[in-house]
Amino acid sequence: MTMQHVFPTYQRFPFAITDGQGVHLTDNHGKTYLDFTAGIGVCNFGYHQPQIQAAVTQQLTHIWHTSNLYENELQDAVAGLLANGEERLVYFANSGTEANEAALKLARKYTGKTGILAFQHSFHGRTYGAMSMTGNPHIQAGYAPLVPGITFATYNDDAALDKITPELAAVILEVVQGEGGVFAGQTAWLQAVNAKCQATGVLLIIDEVQTGIGRTGYRMAYEGYGLDPDIYTVAKGLANGLPVGAMVGRRQLATAFGPGSHGSTFAGNAVAMAAAKCVLPQLTPALLTTVRAHAKLVWQSLATQVEPIPVVKQITGKGLMIGIHLDEQIPVNQVITRLQVEGLLTLSAGDNTLRLLPPIVMQPADLLAGIALIAKVLTTLTTEVTTNE
């Protein structure tokens, strides 16, 4: 199949996914794969999860969309679940980039300041404001002039603390940089950034689009670092595949976000809200403890089976968000293609990094089977490179 009628903005693999069940996907040729992508960190609860499917199916028999001209009980219920007992309010969007745009607008409007500090190798989205806060020149190429007032610092570098001054409106960061190479923030550094923001009156925005909804073994990744953001954004896993995003901010910020200050026609539609209302209560302490335990097994397996392979430079990440950094002799896309042949779907990130984002409900047998396949393919490719030298 060759796609003839769609802009070629994606470099696609030459097969289509036609079905999914649990943590496995099936393509248009009938081949089944173990999924270490979760739709790029979206389907954290896998495919055809009975509770989510039932919630969505039931909502489809009622209302799908009404716009935001009327009160919406589903939105308020999901917002309450996101607030999780804290004094926070929620703005719903359709995606992560929209949620980050809302955070940018709110930060500037509330503080009356324009300066934003972001970080190199970050990714916050592809719409103009979010792209301008993304520390990747490749993403920004050809789109100048970008949104002004945004500066960048080095991630995990104490020198960044000196750039947090009262003149800023906000600092935006990911606690684990996903697209940039799966680099986890150092706890002491993240806490120092949080403290400096509080001391200077600068808003701290944490982008949880990829790290949230249990990905690191916590409801939101920042909780595992003891952070207290003024605003956080979430999207990918929130509705397990339906388009939704959310900006969650302190209640006092509402003074700058009244009627007409921001909006979206589709945001918070009933079907996506039904899915999110089903997803969030499943993030129980028991499940999150299990995710952390399973992640520990995965990291142990990586340390013994994958890390010793000569082409592996380092392994980074947090929880079930993993980056295997490869020697330039082994292009990551070659690894991904070989793994597809073996029946495992994986992702890339950063310069030459194999990224793993399995569903958080995947059981140890499948997780370890996937790691074994990665070790097999990397060992084979190492042998091939050595033979050809």
Curated annotation (Swiss-Prot):
UniProt binding sites for N(2)-acetyl-L-ornithine: 126, 264
Location(s) in or outside the cell: Cytoplasm
Signal peptide: none
Keyword Nucleus carried by entry: no
InterPro entries: AcOrn/SuccOrn_fam (IPR004636), Aminotrans_3 (IPR005814), Aminotrans_3_PPA_site (IPR049704), Class-III_PLP-dep_AT (IPR050103), PyrdxlP-dep_Trfase (IPR015424), PyrdxlP-dep_Trfase_major (IPR015421), PyrdxlP-dep_Trfase_small (IPR015422)
EC number(s) recorded for this UniProt protein: 2.6.1.11
TM segment ranges: none
PROSITE patterns named among the record's database cross-references: AA_TRANSFER_CLASS_3
Keywords linked to the UniProt accession: Amino-acid biosynthesis, Aminotransferase, Arginine biosynthesis, Cytoplasm, Pyridoxal phosphate, Transferase
Assembly, per entry: Homodimer.
Protein name stated in the entry: Acetylornithine aminotransferase
